[in-house]
Design a protein with these regions (language model features):
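Short beta-strand scaffold segments in enzyme catalytic cores
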Residues: 33-39, 160-161
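Residue-level signal for inorganic ion chemistry
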Residues: 16, 34, 82, 122, ...
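Short, basic/aromatic recognition patches
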Residues: 8-28, 148
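Short loop/turn microsegments at loop-to-beta-strand junctions
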Residues: 31-33, 45, 156-158
């Protein structure tokens, strides 16, 4: 059932949500999910996020790496566990097999393959199920995946760097950055969580952008580069062609 969560549930779920953010944009066609297992004694005994390229699922990893007996434990998961077989085994069945007593879910999975079936299976197996804990925060993480499976459309985000008065550069065009170091790092973090980055040819010509992610530890998670250039005017010396 949907609950008004207590502070304890929120604390564990917030940890799970932070785990889900780790691989956001790098789990292939699968959502990036966070999972935290809490023992009957209220101790965290395992935690995991979805593997790179979407496999294994977070629940499976968390169960396999648990440091104690998980029978009777509570599982906090950011998205409804699946109950269908595909490239990965059904997570709902796995939780029942491990005799988990309670599952707290942040957001229901509207994927037609799931769509409440995981929750129903858990309840039919006498597992206590609570949903809706920090659901709005989970939706920010899951929105790209859910928009694709429900509507067949990608999530598109627009990044604009501007000054307080709405300007993007000096009049003479000599300004290099109007952003600070923190906002530039955030921009690179956004690149690491998206499949593609699109710019017009004028951006390439004026900024000589690389369009990659240059954050330590995330350099291999750069997006596909898409350049709108109907006249094929991109200079062969452009940085974007060297990477």
């Amino acid at each position: 059932m949907k609950i008004t969560s207590n502070n304890e549930d929120k604390r564990y779920m917030r940890y799970a949500l932070n785990l889900a953010k780790r691989n956001l944009g790098n789990t292939g066609k699968n959502p990036s999910v966070g999972c935290v297992i809490v023992s009957k004694e209220k101790k965290i005994i395992s935690a995991a996020s979805t593997g790179l390229n979407g496999s294994p699922h977070a629940e499976k990893i968390a169960i396999e790496k648990s440091c104690a007996d998980i029978e009777g434990a509570t599982v906090y998961v950011t998205l409804e566990p699946c109950n269908h077989s595909g490239e990965n085994p059904p997570c709902a069945e796995l939780l029942v097999k491990e005799k988990i007593s309670r599952v707290v879910i942040s957001q229901k999975d509207d994927n037609p393959l799931v769509d409440g079936k995981g929750i129903k299976f858990l309840k039919d197996s006498n597992v206590i199920v609570d949903t809706g804990v920090l659901e709005e925060e989970a939706n920010l993480i899951n929105s790209g995946f859910l928009n694709r499976v429900k509507n067949g459309k990608p999530n598109i985000n627009i990044k604009i760097a501007s000054s307080a008065d709405g300007k993007t550069a000096l009049r003479d065009g000599k300004s290099k950055w109007i952003t600070n170091d923190l906002s530039r790092k955030y921009g690179h973090r956004l690149r690491s969580t998206h499949d593609a980055i699109l710019v017009g040819i004028n951006t390439i010509i004026s900024d000589n952008s690389k369009l990659n992610c240059r954050l330590n530890g995330l350099k291999n998670q750069s997006p596909v580069k898409v350049i709108v250039d109907s006249r094929l005017s991109i200079p062969l010396s452009a940085n974007v062609l060297k990477i």
